[in-house]
């Protein structure tokens, strides 16, 4: 199974967060538990990654042990590794640095997300035990799961996404009444995060399809929050016997560790309609058929992907043709007429959808002009020129006859 390194604040977390770790182990993950300051830690050995996934459940760590640091974790992400990070109000510098590398800014140490309208009935008084509604989740079933969830319990630090980073995903936002500040101090300055800008859980899919999820709450993954009842403190609020934390945590782990939302390109073929093999070069205005097999990873097996919005572009610097691919059994195909332009073109499928890995396929082909023998003998648009040429010939012939056979009358003296 996928090799996963779990860095813990202390080994007690194995017991307090056992349901989450058991769900991973049941899905075949090989979990290696270490404390985050263990002197023997290593992610990379001889240029090879020792693990496929990294789970960091050690919010307050000030220095990782062994040869792990923010640079090696960033290199791990650059190499396609998956990382799940859980923080808390007691957050150390390494996690803050890792967040800023990924376009996410954590609030200061000792701050918490506060919501005076959406806190749980069991909150001790600081209104930091927040009930997050499922409506605030990102609308992406591949990331947050397909079923409707009960409200989610959250207690931890707030985050803000870098507005210039288009890769950051706002997976769970605070409500419009939430903000992030020190829970035990009066507010003297504008909070770091206010309203919907407050991120409780954020994600990132890098351009190399590496995935990272940041949760501002370590308690979010705890057995206590998984099995707790939840009810907002507002009068008349509905009581739920269980939170939606477990279902959301499992869905997030399936996505971040690439069990969900992974696409790949299978066989690609192209040829003239009526033929089976691709030619050395196409001719302008040929009728062409293109087909591509796209597969999705599901429970460890590759199955045909079902999408109705996959487009094919026929590109020579700019697209000359852009058309939807139609599903035909296990593959997508389309027939279209090549443009009346010759050059070097590409069949390009560039499919980028929320929650799925970036799918890209390009096949280069040549399109040549018609050979001289392929043109029609007479072109309708040239009829005026033909008429002009033939009328000139006929006119010259008639003029010649008249000129040659006309005698001038002799002048009489």
Swiss-Prot record:
Taxonomy, superkingdom: Eukaryota
Topology feature Lumenal, residues: 1-383
Keyword DNA damage among UniProt keywords: no
One cellular component (GO) term of this entry: oligosaccharyltransferase complex
Pathway: Protein modification; protein glycosylation
InterPro entries from the UniProt entry: DDOST_48_kDa_subunit, OST48_MD, OST48_N
UniProt keyword Protein transport, yes or no: no
Localisation: Endoplasmic reticulum; Endoplasmic reticulum membrane
Residues in the Cytoplasmic compartment per record: 405-413
Gene Ontology terms: biological process: protein glycosylation; protein N-linked glycosylation via asparagine
Chain segments annotated as transmembrane: 384-404
Pfam family membership, one: OST48_MD
Main location class: endoplasmic reticulum
Its membrane topology: Single-pass type I membrane protein
Record note on quaternary structure: Component of the oligosaccharyltransferase (OST) complex.
Known function: Subunit of the oligosaccharyl transferase (OST) complex that catalyzes the initial transfer of a defined glycan (Glc(3)Man(9)GlcNAc(2) in eukaryotes) from the lipid carrier dolichol-pyrophosphate to an asparagine residue within an Asn-X-Ser/Thr consensus motif in nascent polypeptide chains, the first step in protein N-glycosylation. N-glycosylation occurs cotranslationally and the complex associates with the Sec61 complex at the channel-forming translocon complex that mediates protein translocation across the endoplasmic reticulum (ER). All subunits are required for a maximal enzyme activity.
Protein name: Dolichyl-diphosphooligosaccharide--protein glycosyltransferase 48 kDa subunit
């Amino acid at each position: 199974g996928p090799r996963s390194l779990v860095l813990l604040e202390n080994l007690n977390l194995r017991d307090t967060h056992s349901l989450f770790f058991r769900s991973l182990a049941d899905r075949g993950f090989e979990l290696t538990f270490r404390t985050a300051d263990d002197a023997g830690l290593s992610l990379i050995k001889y240029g090879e990654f020792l693990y496929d996934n990294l789970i960091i459940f050690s919010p307050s760590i000030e220095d990782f042990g062994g040869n792990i640091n923010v640079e090696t974790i960033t290199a791990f992400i650059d190499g396609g590794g998956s990382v799940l990070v859980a923080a808390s109000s007691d957050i150390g510098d390494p996690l803050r640095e890792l967040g800023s590398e990924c376009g996410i800014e954590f609030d200061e140490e000792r701050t918490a997300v506060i919501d005076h309208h959406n806190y749980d009935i069991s909150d001790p008084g600081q209104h930091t035990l927040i009930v997050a509604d499922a409506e605030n989740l990102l609308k992406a079933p591949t990331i947050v799961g397909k079923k409707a969830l009960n409200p989610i319990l959250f207690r931890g630090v707030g985050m803000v996404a870098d507005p210039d980073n288009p890769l950051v995903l706002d997976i769970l936002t605070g409500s419009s009444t939430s903000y992030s500040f020190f829970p035990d101090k009066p507010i003297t300055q504008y909070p770091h995060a206010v309203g919907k800008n407050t991120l409780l859980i954020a994600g990132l899919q890098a351009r190399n399809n590496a995935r990272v999820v940041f949760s501002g709450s370590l308690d979010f993954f705890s057995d206590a929050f998984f099995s707790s009842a939840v009810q907002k403190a507002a009068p008349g609020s509905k009581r739920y016997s269980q939170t939606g934390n477990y279902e959301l945590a499992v869905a997030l782990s399936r996505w971040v560790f690439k069990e969900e939302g992974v696409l790949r390109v299978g066989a690609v073929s192209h040829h003239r309609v009526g033929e089976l093999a691709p030619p050395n070069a196409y001719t302008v205005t040929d009728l062409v058929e293109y087909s591509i097999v796209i597969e999705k990873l599901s429970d460890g097996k590759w199955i045909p992907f079902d999408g109705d919005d996959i487009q094919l572009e026929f590109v020579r610097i700019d697209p000359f043709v852009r058309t939807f691919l139609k599903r035909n059994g296990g593959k997508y195909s389309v027939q279209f007429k090549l443009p009346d332009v010759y050059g070097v073109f590409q069949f390009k499928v560039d499919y980028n959808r929320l929650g799925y890995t970036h799918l890209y396929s390009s096949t280069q082909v040549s399109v040549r002009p018609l050979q001289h023998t392929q043109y029609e003998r007479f072109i309708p648009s040239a009829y005026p020129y033909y008429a002009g040429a033939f009328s000139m010939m006929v006119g010259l012939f008639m003029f010649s006859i008249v000129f040659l056979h006309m005698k001038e009358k002799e002048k009489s003296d």
